[in-house]
Structures are given as C-alpha cells and as structure tokens.
Swiss-Prot record:
GO biological process terms, semicolon-separated: ribosomal small subunit biogenesis; translation
NCBIfam families: PRK05327.1, rpsD_bact
UniProt record similarity statement: Belongs to the universal ribosomal protein uS4 family.
HAMAP family the UniProt entry points to: Ribosomal_uS4_B
Role summary: One of the primary rRNA binding proteins, it binds directly to 16S rRNA where it nucleates assembly of the body of the 30S subunit.
Protein name: Small ribosomal subunit protein uS4
Residue intervals passing through the bilayer: none
One of the record's GO molecular function terms: structural constituent of ribosome
Limits of the S4 RNA-binding domain: 92-156
InterPro entries per record: Ribosomal_uS4 (IPR022801), Ribosomal_uS4_bac-type (IPR005709), Ribosomal_uS4_CS (IPR018079), Ribosomal_uS4_N (IPR001912), S4_RNA-bd (IPR002942), S4_RNA-bd_sf (IPR036986)
Lineage: Bacteria, Bacillati, Actinomycetota, Actinomycetes, Kitasatosporales
The entry's keywords: Ribonucleoprotein, Ribosomal protein, RNA-binding, rRNA-binding
Disulphide bridges, residue numbers: none
GO CC annotations, alphabetized: small ribosomal subunit
C-alpha cells in the first residue's frame, strides 16, 4: 500500500504550512520548498504571492477551486470584510467543524467520516462535507458508528493536539457530539492565511 502521507508532506512544504500532524516533523526538519533548489528560490511576483495564499487557504480545508470560488461569492454578499467572511464561510463546513471538535485528526479524516455516513446533524445523517452548519445545530457521531476504532480514539481525546477547543463550539467528546454555539470570529479560527491576499487574487 503506498504511503499516502508523502504527497501531503510535499504539499505542506510547498505551501509553507503543515497540513497534517505527520507533516509537522518533516516541515520542521526541512523548512523550505521541496526540490533540489527549494532553499534558493527567486522572489515571487505579486500574482504568485496572492495565488500561493489562496492555495494555502484551499489546502487547509481540502476543497476544490470551484468550491473556493463559490464560498468567495457568498462572502462578497456578507456584511463586513470579505476576507474574514470567506474564512468564516469555510469554517462552517461540516468536515471543518468535525476536525475542530477533536472527533477527527485531520481534515482528510473528517471528510471521510462525513462521506461514509458516520455523522449526523440534528438527528439526521449528513454525508456532504460541504454542509453548512448553523448556530445551535447539534452534530454527533451516529450511534451505529461509535464503536469503530477512530471514534473510540476520539472519545479518549486522542486527536486533541493542543487542548484548546474553539470558543464557538461546545464539545462533549465522551458523547462524540458538539454544538455550534454561534458563528465563528475570524480571530478564533485556527487557519494560517492572509485572507486579504485571497480577496485581491479573486478581485484581480
């Protein structure tokens, strides 16, 4: 079976962010882009800087360009700064919140949990990672899935890497459940991104 972590490690180094816990060690050991000449790359153009920032944000939510563009279109219609609204829009995705709650270890695992029908919202199965969670929605692992190993690990806090749960979530890992108390504030969302550069990319 091929090592599925290697492409993500290489992608992490190219984007300058660790996309998985395993990538953190590689990134710390080699904090430069992949390739023989990674350490001596030329200064990027303004366009490339904006493109890279957009790709960094996309990668942290593991979404397609089409999904990103749709989220940006919705963010433009929201009140306040478009960049902040974009990040909040992405953070309300079901797979993103499953990750933040500590039920999953990575965004990739969170997506699989949703796609495979292990997650329910307000008592009904939801298998779309892009499902937008609303304040007061209750998300939990379905009863039939709770005995599976990944969820047993989550129940014991095995995926909780920093001990901090975002303030917009109320989490009960023992019950494998959480509630979105309110819309997230951009400053509370743990993603690495200069969202203004992303806005400039789409507004070009």
């Amino acid at each position: 079976m091929p090592n599925q972590s290697r492409p993500k490690v290489k992608k992490s180094r190219a984007l300058g962010i660790a996309l998985t816990p395993k990538a953190v060690k590689y990134f710390e050991a080699r904090p430069y882009p992949p390739g023989e000449h990674g350490r001596g790359r030329k200064q990027n153009s303004d366009y490339k800087v904006r493109l890279l920032e957009k790709q960094r944000l996309r990668a942290q939510y593991d979404i397609s360009e089409r999904q990103m563009a749709r989220a940006y279109d919705r963010a433009k219609k929201a009140e306040g700064k478009t960049g902040e609204a974009l990040v909040v829009e992405l953070e309300r995705r079901l797979d993103a919140l499953v990750l933040r709650s500590g039920i999953a270890r990575t965004i990739y695992q969170a997506r699989q949990m949703v796609v495979h029908g292990h997650i329910e919202v307000n008592g009904g199965k939801v298998d779309k990672p892009s499902f937008r969670v609303r304040p007061d929605d209750i998300v939990q692992v379905r009863e039939r899935s709770r005995s599976k190993v990944p969820f047993q690990v989550a129940r014991e806090g095995g995926y909780d890497t920093d001990g901090e749960t975002p303030r917009y979530l109320q989490v009960n890992l023992k019950a494998l459940a959480f509630r979105l108390d309110r819309d997230p504030n951009r400053k509370e969302i743990p993603v690495i991104c200069d969202e203004q550069l992303v806005v400039e990319y789409y507004a070009r």
